[in-house]
Amino acid sequence: MTADSCNPCLTLENTIDVQEVPMTKSVVLADPRGFCAGVDRAILTVQTILKAAEASGKRTREDGLPPVYVRRQIVHNKHVVEDLAGQGAVFVQELAEIPDAAAQAGIPVVFSAHGVSPVVKAEAERRGMHVVDATCPLVGKVHREVLRFVREGYEIVYIGHKGHDEAVGVVGESPEHVHLIEHESDVDSLDFAPDTKLVLLSQTTLSVDETADTIAALKAKFPWIQEPPSSDICYATSNRQAAVKLVAQQSDCVVIVGSANSSNSVRLMEVAQEGLGERGKAYRVDDASELDPAWFEGLESVGISSGASVPDELVSGVIDALQNLGFTGMKSVETIKENMHFVLPAELRRKK
């Protein structure tokens, strides 16, 4: 990222203190794991607005309006959403749920890290809403690529999960020119003339491994299809999956902490299962309360990682639960140190 994209106030350091202890039963902890820079930025965006409202005495307003509205889950983790809601943020599915009085009062409306389509932005502008856009800069890059390629006359094949907030926003940039596919088998449904300018883009939370077969099928059917100069795959997606692969090799089972609607958390579980093979099973839990002690009977080592939207305290809770089950040893598997940071949205920086 450029120097302007760096903010020393945002850190991605994991907070769990790992001291390797050689014990019979142990936890194998993936590093990196948890919050990525885009998630950190999105959460801090809402927290900054809440703190400003608190400081100005506007957290509880006489008109009954909240200090901030957030369209959709700011990140795909229910604990993060519940925590921010407890501080006063109001989450809505659509802008129509926000009263006109809120727009007139200048109540901030935050767009989530996953991005939104031009239709949503146009509605917010029409209603005079004070928008703070917390779209992850890496997602924003894909939006800009769509617009550029459409201007240059391309048809765009976009690999993503149908219905995922990120995919909905990207496709919405130009629905008539962006063709969403999910799997290798979907390539058969595409039909382009040989003189069609084609380019391939993908959802940031997919991995290189996950898209490899689909990309190969696309290139086999449309040999002239182009790829952008740099990958759309998020660094955090690649890093977390690489760490989980190594953790799975050293574990009898793997627990991924993350919500069911988190694309990267679900994929981490799949990557872990692929790494385990027939030796063991991978599980996904929102928090320690969903652990089943029966999963760990007869095991010597349990691997742990978490999705990019997961606070480290939830991982700590899982570790504590496993320690109570006798997994008192601790080993960390580090594949890379992350130092990516994103500044707050421009709407908040202008206020400083």
From Swiss-Prot:
This protein's pathway reads: Isoprenoid biosynthesis; dimethylallyl diphosphate biosynthesis; dimethylallyl diphosphate from (2E)-4-hydroxy-3-methylbutenyl diphosphate: step 1/1; Isoprenoid biosynthesis; isopentenyl diphosphate biosynthesis via DXP pathway; isopentenyl diphosphate from 1-deoxy-D-xylulose 5-phosphate: step 6/6
Q: Which Pfam families match?
A: LYTB
Write down the InterPro entries for this protein, in alphabetical order.
LytB/IspH (IPR003451)
The top EC class is: oxidoreductase
Cofactor binding annotation: Binds 1 [4Fe-4S] cluster per subunit.
Please list the residues that make up the active site. E166
Signal peptide range: none
Cofactor(s) needed by this chain: [4Fe-4S] cluster
- Swiss-Prot/TrEMBL keywords: 4Fe-4S, Iron, Iron-sulfur, Isoprene biosynthesis, Metal-binding, Oxidoreductase
Family per similarity comment = Belongs to the IspH family.
Protein's UniProt name: 4-hydroxy-3-methylbut-2-enyl diphosphate reductase
The species is: Bifidobacterium longum (strain NCC 2705)
**Originating gene:** ispH
